């Protein structure tokens, strides 16, 4: 969730925050269960080049074709409900990936459950009318980019292992009843925040 100075100070006071020197040697699976690596949106992908992955015979779940972001102009004093900035990020990602909107088989997103969701849904309806749309229930609060990464990881894992994709039910028939592709080749992963931070990435499976 979001970070605040008071939260960090509290964790630090009880000795539950790694020091800078300790972080230099941090590895996943630390033997010390009490220590905490505290971050806003605790979700990340471990990335490497295709060449490196193939050398060590690693499982490849997908490859990143492009990434783009766009921040809305403004004073960040209110909700940003327009989809213009989000669409700029999407267009940039598609252009970098040399991919047409019609080639996108699946849109992975992170709904907030409020009016902000309409900006993504508007772009989905207009630009990707034949693409499935999916998220998962493991949202990390209002940290949209981390929630989207979490959903993307689930989708890529299911596709790799031949597991049917499970998607979060929204209660909106337009979304819940939309057919999902069995073997999507290109995925658009996208997120947008209420203060106008927009992210889009294109993946090949």
Name each region found by the language model.
Residues 117-131:
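Glycine- and aromatic-enriched membrane alpha-helices
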Residues 106-109, 189:
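Conserved beta-strand positions
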Residues 1-15, 19-29, 33-34, 68-81, ...:
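Acyl-CoA/ACP chain-elongation machinery
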Residues 22-99, 103-106, 130, 185, ...:
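Condensing-enzyme catalytic core mediating Claisen C-C bond formation in acyl metabolism
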Residues 10-14, 123-125, 203-205:
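Short, solvent-exposed amphipathic alpha-helical segments in soluble enzyme
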Residues 178-205:
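Structural signal for terminal/edge beta-strands and the immediately following C-terminal loop/tail
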Residues 51-52, 114, 193-195:
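Short, glycine-/Ser/Thr-/acidic-enriched flexible segments
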């Amino acid at each position: 969730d979001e970070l605040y100075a008071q939260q960090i100070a509290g964790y630090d006071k009880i000795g539950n925050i790694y020091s800078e020197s300790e972080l230099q040697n941090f590895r996943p699976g630390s033997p010390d269960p009490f220590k905490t690596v505290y971050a806003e949106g605790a979700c990340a992908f471990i990335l490497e080049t295709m060449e490196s992955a193939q050398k060590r015979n690693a499982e490849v779940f997908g490859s990143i074709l492009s990434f783009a972001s766009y921040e809305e102009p403004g004073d960040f004093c209110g909700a940003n409900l327009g989809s213009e900035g989000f669409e700029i990020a999407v267009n940039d990602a598609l252009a970098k990936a040399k991919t047409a909107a019609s080639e996108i088989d699946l849109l992975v997103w992170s709904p907030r459950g409020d009016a902000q969701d309409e900006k993504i849904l508007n772009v989905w309806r207009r630009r990707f009318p034949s693409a499935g749309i999916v998220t998962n229930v493991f949202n990390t609060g209002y940290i949209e980019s981390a929630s989207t990464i979490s959903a993307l990881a689930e989708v890529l894992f299911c596709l790799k292992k031949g597991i049917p994709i499970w998607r979060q039910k929204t209660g909106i028939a337009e979304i819940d009843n939309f057919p999902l592709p069995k073997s999507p080749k290109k995925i658009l992963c996208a997120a947008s925040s209420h203060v106008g931070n927009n992210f889009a990435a294109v993946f090949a499976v």
